[in-house]
Design a protein with these regions (language model features):
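Catalytic histidine-centered segment of alpha/beta-hydrolase-like enzymes
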Residues: 152-164
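Flexible "cap/lid" subdomain of the alpha/beta-hydrolase fold that forms the substrate-access gate
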Residues: 1-148, 168-170
């Protein structure tokens, strides 16, 4: 939507198509949830139901900079994950990413982003370990700029000042 989107910031992500076309053992280990959450309903929902705390502590927030998420904030994540509709919506988002979103990506492969694009990722995260993050965006956003921040995947929680400064400069 070039008439609407004038600037784009991408946080610790590579194109979905890149993830699915460049699967490796390391990617599958770090990003197994991409393959687990796309399984047909109700399997992921059923397995996650009632198990939000171990899922969040041992997987979703693994590699997180210590104390980046305060206990009251973690409690809010738990509250949200206790709602079966939240878990179902999360699974549906990943299911769309592996189906209709990929179809749209294939149809748009030759389209390049015209707006200024900022790509930020965590130097301690899986994306940094597995990909040249900025280069994965070059075919779609040739003028993209970006850098690694001192974080894992959770940039807003792990390095809020650095993220805010980078976004403020980019959006000014």
């Amino acid at each position: 939507h070039p008439q609407t989107v004038t600037r784009l910031a991408l946080l610790d992500i590579v194109p979905t198509r890149t993830v699915y076309t460049q699967v490796s053992k390391n990617l599958a280990t770090w990003y197994f949830h991409w393959f687990f959450l796309i399984q047909p309903e109700p399997l992921p929902e059923m397995l996650l139901g009632g198990h939000a705390e171990p899922f969040l502590r041992n997987f979703a927030f693994r590699g997180l900079i210590p104390h980046a998420i305060a206990e009251p904030v973690f409690a809010e994540y738990l509250r949200c994950f206790a709602n079966p509709q939240t878990v179902h919506a999360m699974c549906e988002d990943y299911r769309a990413g592996a189906s209709i979103d990929l179809q749209h990506d294939e149809a748009d492969l030759s389209t390049q982003l015209a707006c200024p694009t900022l790509v930020l990722w965590g130097v301690h995260g899986a994306m940094h370990r597995l990909f040249d993050v900025l280069e994965t965006w070059r075919p779609r956003a040739p003028a993209a700029q970006g850098k690694a921040l001192p974080a894992g995947h959770w940039l807003p929680e792990e390095c809020p000042q650095e993220l805010t400064a980078a976004l403020a400069e980019f959006l000014a």
